[in-house]
Amino acid sequence: MEQEQDTPWTQSTEHINIQKKGSGQQTQRLGRPNLTQLMDHYLRIMSQVDMHKQTVSWKQWLSLKNPTQGSLKTRVLKRWKSFNKQGWTD
């Protein structure tokens, strides 16, 4: 089997595990996270991003003063179109 080479991606995703020795000194051991850990981390981050977007959206919504049905419809359509252009790249 070929040995896996370090890339910027694998280097940036390495976890540092700190283990105590019997003498009380600490040593660091680098290890790559498995796929489950990476997916868990990704989902946690995306969930935080989604919550932030919802909060910003509601703040904008609440900041509208006496919105009419027409102005709300226009605003929602603009946001929907911009979201569709961006897709999953947010």
UniProtKB/Swiss-Prot annotation:
Name under which the protein is recorded: Protein PB1-F2
Residue ranges of the TM segments: none
Miscellaneous information on this protein: Is not encoded in all strains, and seems to be dispensable for replication.
Domain of life: Viruses
Function comment: Plays an important role in promoting lung pathology in both primary viral infection and secondary bacterial infection. Promotes alteration of mitochondrial morphology, dissipation of mitochondrial membrane potential, and cell death. Alternatively, inhibits the production of interferon in the infected cell at the level of host mitochondrial antiviral signaling MAVS. Its level of expression differs greatly depending on which cell type is infected, in a manner that is independent of the levels of expression of other viral proteins. Monocytic cells are more affected than epithelial cells.
Description of how the protein assembles with itself and partners: Oligomer. Interacts with human SLC25A6/ANT3 and VDAC1. Interacts with host MAVS.
Entry keyword set: Apoptosis, Host cytoplasm, Host membrane, Host mitochondrion, Host mitochondrion inner membrane, Host nucleus, Host-virus interaction, Inhibition of host innate immune response by virus, Inhibition of host MAVS by virus, Inhibition of host RLR pathway by virus, Membrane, Modulation of host cell apoptosis by virus, Viral immunoevasion
Localization terms from the record: Host mitochondrion inner membrane; Host nucleus; Host cytoplasm, Host cytosol
GO CC, one annotated term: host cell cytosol
One BP term from GO: symbiont-mediated perturbation of host apoptosis
Annotated positions for site Low pathogenicity: N66
InterPro entries referenced in this protein's UniProt entry, alphabetically: Flu_proapoptotic_PB1-F2
Organism annotation: Influenza A virus (strain A/Port Chalmers/1/1973 H3N2)
Residue span of region Disordered: 1-31
Similarity annotation: Belongs to the influenza viruses PB1-F2 family.
HAMAP family on file: INFV_PB1F2 (MF_04064)
Disulfide bonds: none
Region feature (Mitochondrial targeting sequence): 65-87
